[in-house]
Amino acid sequence: LKTRPVSTWHNNADQHHYFQLAFAKPPVSAHTGYLKARSAFSGSPSNKVEHMKTLSQWLAHLETAYTGGTAHSHGSIDLGLERVRAVKERMDLQPQCPVIVVAGTNGKGSVCAFLESIYRAAGFKTGMLTSPHILRYNERICVNGQPAADETITASFERIEAARGDTALTYFEFNTLAAVDIFRRAEADVMILEVGLGGRLDAVNIFDGDVAVVTSVDLDHQDFLGDTVEQVAFEKAGVFRAGKPAICAQNPPPESLRHHAEAIGADLLLAGRDFGFSKLEQQQWSFHFHPKHSSLFSGSRNRNALPFPA
């Protein structure tokens, strides 16, 4: 693993314009619903924040003051990722280690869990952001397989609150910033970030993935992402980056995903075409990596006689 380079690619407006011509955009109501849901917040810092001491108090505050499906009366709604990106820059939250971003309709959590386990078994210190949690909020933010402590999370919330000023943030945007803040302070060797919803406009997408994964694409969150698989796929493909591996486990992928990867110069790797696995006898399996159209990789790499997970 090497320290990740700082990417200068932040805006895919040109590519978005291309797809406005090539593919039908999601209905206005769908985009409005998505942006409305992602922009439901309270604008100004609340006096209540001064009294936030426990994690449960913080979460109750964020759930009531920053979410709810409608904009509060403090200021105007600022659509897109500009708000959360501005707070990220004030906090200097540029990851200093490789970042893996995982999107998709199904299988995101499983992929994150497998990646985290593999890296940790290889001796790397991991930071993993997932959602939703099952029992406790802390499960969303794990360092080396262990949920972050209440005190660690509340300290991060306080830093975010101090940095945001009058910039409004949603519950999930707080969650995303806190995770990366905690991983940086823990000096993680790799960050694994699961997208919450979609990809292109999700808070996780303010961080450039050194590798981006789309597990699968199907109709989900149609009110937010669109009514066709192609529309959903375009939103999820928004996590791809120029010159970086873009892995898709669905082959053939939706055309909008394929074309977006080509348009921005991402290195698209498809299951079955560029990598795959086969079952062997005696509870073993093999992994094959044979990129056909990759600009980053050449030749084949095989791993044979791998044991089945216990």
Per-range role (PLM):
Residues 72-81, 85-96, 121-207, 223-225, ...:
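ATP-dependent carboxylate-amine ligase catalytic core
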Residues 56-57, 147-169, 219-233, 237, ...:
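Adenine nucleotide phosphate-binding catalytic loops in nucleotide-utilizing enzymes
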